[in-house]
Amino acid sequence: MFISISAGVVTFLITLVGIPAFIQFYRKAQITGQQMHEDVKQHQAKAGTPTMGGLVFLIAAVVVSFLLALFSKQLTNNVGMILFILVLYGLVGFLDDFLKVFRKINEGLNPKQKLALQLLGGVIFYLFYERGGDMLSVFSYQVHLGIFYIIFALFWLVGFSNAVNLTDGIDGLASISVVISLSAYGVIAYVQGQMDILLVILAMIGGLLGFFVFNHKPAKVFMGDVGSLALGGMLAAISMALHQEWTLLIIGIVYVFETTSVMMQVSYFKLTGGKRIFRMTPVHHHFELGGLSGKGNPWSEWKVDFFFWGVGLLASLLTLAILYLM
């Protein structure tokens, strides 16, 4: 347990020191920074804010986790594959950010390129992590999926990777939402006695808390796709490594809601010839523009943050209650 806590503290301190250095480098190199393409007026002031800050906490968490797991003889297959997903999905995000920031290609990687790399990572993860005989845990039941488990695994990894990416739309929202989700999985890992996975979880929590110091409103840096895609993949990988896949639907309700809002909006728009359900999606922008109803007073970013964090916290507590109190 001491090693796991140490991982979190060390990663927190590295990120706390690393982010200011990253921002300073960004400014000195006169890199353009974040481009704003959203129809939210208050976001236009964010244009030029350094992005790709996720690179700092990602490298810190991966290196610290690897070294401490190696030192404490906890470098298991599961740890290795969770770190692999962090690195590969982080690389996909890095390439996406690089094309946007340095090559001025607004869409970054095209969807097919991004999906191909994410699927490749998913296949490798499936082949090498310690899976439970292709069994899918649903509450207290075990469903044998056989060869179809790989389809589920790919859907889970790619889906939640992109879902967290959609959530990263206002200052601090994604970073603390993921801290809450990881904290719930930290409890599950501890109860299961999987201290190896707990080490990686606490390392990333430390990195995200260090990052949040500079990412809360008004954000001095954004995590970019390099951070958000890696974090989403990590959550999916951890849920599978702990054999509690179903829990991510509740623990990750914020990401599910964000993604569902986009799917509903696009479908309804096409079916009705231009009508919308929400003012704007992902749905956090709907609240920014007009509160819960979309027609009321606009919510500040802090208010949206606390609302979503509250939902995520309640969902995480509900999941733990279902697992251990019912």
Swiss-Prot record:
Protein name (Swiss-Prot/TrEMBL): Phospho-N-acetylmuramoyl-pentapeptide-transferase
Recorded catalytic activity of this chain's protein: UDP-N-acetyl-alpha-D-muramoyl-L-alanyl-gamma-D-glutamyl-L-lysyl-D-alanyl-D-alanine + di-trans,octa-cis-undecaprenyl phosphate = Mur2Ac(oyl-L-Ala-gamma-D-Glu-L-Lys-D-Ala-D-Ala)-di-trans,octa-cis-undecaprenyl diphosphate + UMP
Regions that span the bilayer: 3-23, 51-71, 79-99, 115-135, 138-158, 169-189, 195-215, 221-243, 306-326
MF annotations from Gene Ontology: metal ion binding; phospho-N-acetylmuramoyl-pentapeptide-transferase activity
Gene: mraY
Cofactor: Mg(2+)
EC class of the enzyme, as a word: transferase
Entries under HAMAP family matching the protein: MraY
Lineage: Bacteria, Bacillati, Bacillota, Bacilli, Lactobacillales
GO cellular component annotations of the record: plasma membrane
InterPro entries: Glycosyl_transferase_4, PNAcMuramoyl-5peptid_Trfase, PNAcMuramoyl-5peptid_Trfase_CS
Topology relative to the membrane: Multi-pass membrane protein
Main location: membrane
Documented EC number(s): 2.7.8.13
